[in-house]
Amino acid sequence: MKLENLKSKEGSRHKTKRVGRGFGSGIGKTSTRGSKGQKSRKSGHTRPGFEGGQTTLYRRIPKIGFNNKNFANNYNVVTLNNIVKLNLANVDKKVLVEKGLIEDNKLPIKVIGTATISKPISVSAHKFSKGSVATLEKSKSKFVVIK
C-alpha cells in the first residue's frame, strides 16, 4: 500500500459549495442569502444575545456576587507525604524547586497533609497546615516558618 493509492471512503467527502459564481451554477446572484434584508448583507448577522435593539437579557439582570481572585493569597502547595518521599534531612525552597515539587518560584510555599515520618526532618516553608504541624511535632521534626 502506498500513500498515492489511498482513497477516502465513499460519501465521506463532499464538494465545497462555491456560491456567487454565475447563474449557471444555480447558486449565483444572491448566493443562497435571499433577496433583501439584514441577513443578506455582507455584515448582516447580529452578535449573540442581540434582541433587536431591546435591552438584552444579560444587561437587564442585576450584577451579583464578588470575586477576590486579584487579591487572593496563592501558594505553592506541597504535601508532607511528597516531602517524606524525598528522603532528605533538610528540605527548603531550593530543594523543592530542584526536585520539581513546586512550579512557581515566586509564590510562597505551604505544606499540607499528614504522613508517617520515620526519622526527624527539617522543613522550611512560609505556611504549615494544622495537620502537618501536628505530624512534624509528633515525629520530633523541625519546621521553620519563613517570613
Curated annotation (Swiss-Prot):
SUPFAM superfamilies xref list: Ribosomal proteins L15p and L18e (SSF52080)
Gene Ontology molecular functions: rRNA binding; structural constituent of ribosome
Alphabetical list of InterPro entries matching this protein: Ribosomal_uL15, Ribosomal_uL15/eL18, Ribosomal_uL15/eL18_sf, Ribosomal_uL15_bac-type
Disulfide-linked positions: none
Composition bias, Basic and acidic residues: 1-13
Function: Binds to the 23S rRNA.
Family: Belongs to the universal ribosomal protein uL15 family.
Subunit structure: Part of the 50S ribosomal subunit.
Protein name per Swiss-Prot or TrEMBL: Large ribosomal subunit protein uL15
UniProt source species: Malacoplasma penetrans (strain HF-2)
